[in-house]
Amino acid sequence: MSKKQSSTPHDALFKLFLRQPDTARDFLAFHLPAPIHALCDMKTLKLESSSFIDDDLRESYSDVLWSVKTEQGPGYIYCLIEHQSTSNKLIAFRMMRYAIAAMQNHLDAGYKTLPMVVPLLFYHGIESPYPYSLCWLDCFADPKLARQLYASAFPLIDVTVMPDDEIMQHRRMALLELIQKHIRQRDLMGLVEQMACLLSSGYANDRQIKGLFNYILQTGDAVRFNDFIDGVAERSPKHKESLMTIAERLRQEGEQSKALHIAKIMLESGVPLADIMRFTGLSEEELAAASQ
């Protein structure tokens, strides 16, 4: 398929006809699936811009996009009429990309639900009949598996309803799942035993452990953070030293962050530099960085 299809005489003639409302109504009357056509209020037929389409996608298409309101209640149906003078094995996928872009554009306009976008392919190439499937799922190497995945709800990992005992069996994912399930609890002390058990399993590296406790400090119950990390450390002899080091470093980083925040406010308020240094304990270099 030519990269610049819209410059061909085939495309020019196609658009000359299909961008006329009366011609489009007749086209849709004959070619739009009857159950969908019955839902359309053809008096509301409106030619839509395709400026929302990515440049790389737009250059691959010669398309006309019409919208109509539905006969029953508020709602829109978009009719994507694509022109091809040569066959393309992946055209169904490309039309699906266009359809999804049209749906996103509809949401960006303020609507709260997805519209129906009906792709229709107008073809008059040399190969006859059209040699490829127009079901985008057939574009996959394993169409059967694609149907199983994309014709049903996507897999959901909802830790909010997952029993803790089940989470504890999830090896390297267990720490993440357990903490993010319970992070909004007012008191995390009830997780001390489980946390210590998971740390003792050796599934998390030092970087992950530091990130985990930093997350708890920032997002969880900061007031009892010291008690929490001390409790975990006492039950994890192997990690006790590193946990206490992490805890102290996080406390220092937290204090440093607070001091920098206060210093920035004081700088913006015009407080003399010497007074800020005395009040916050920050150096002149640290204050210079805070002012950036």
Swiss-Prot record:
Cofactor: Mg(2+)
Outcome of substituting Q84K: No longer increases recombination efficiency, toxicity or SOS response
UniProt-listed InterPro entries: Rpn/YhgA-like_nuclease (IPR051699), RpnA (IPR010106), Transposase_31 (IPR006842)
Modulation of this protein's activity: Inhibited by EDTA, Zn(2+) and by Mg(2+) plus Mn(2+); stimulated by Ca(2+) in the presence of Mg(2+).
Signal peptide coordinates: none
pH dependence of activity: Optimum pH is 9.0, active between pH 7.5 and 10.5.
Keywords (A to Z) from UniProt: DNA recombination, Endonuclease, Hydrolase, Magnesium, Nuclease
Effect of R94A: No longer increases recombination efficiency or SOS response, more toxic than wild-type
GO biological process: DNA recombination
Role, per record: A low activity DNA endonuclease yielding 3'-hydroxyl ends, equally active on ss or dsDNA, not active on dsRNA. Shows no sequence specificity. Upon expression enhances RecA-independent DNA recombination 49-fold, concomitantly reducing viability by 88% and probably inducing DNA damage as measured by induction of the SOS repair response in RecA cells.
Protein name (database record): Recombination-promoting nuclease RpnA
Organism ancestry: Bacteria, Pseudomonadati, Pseudomonadota, Gammaproteobacteria, Enterobacterales
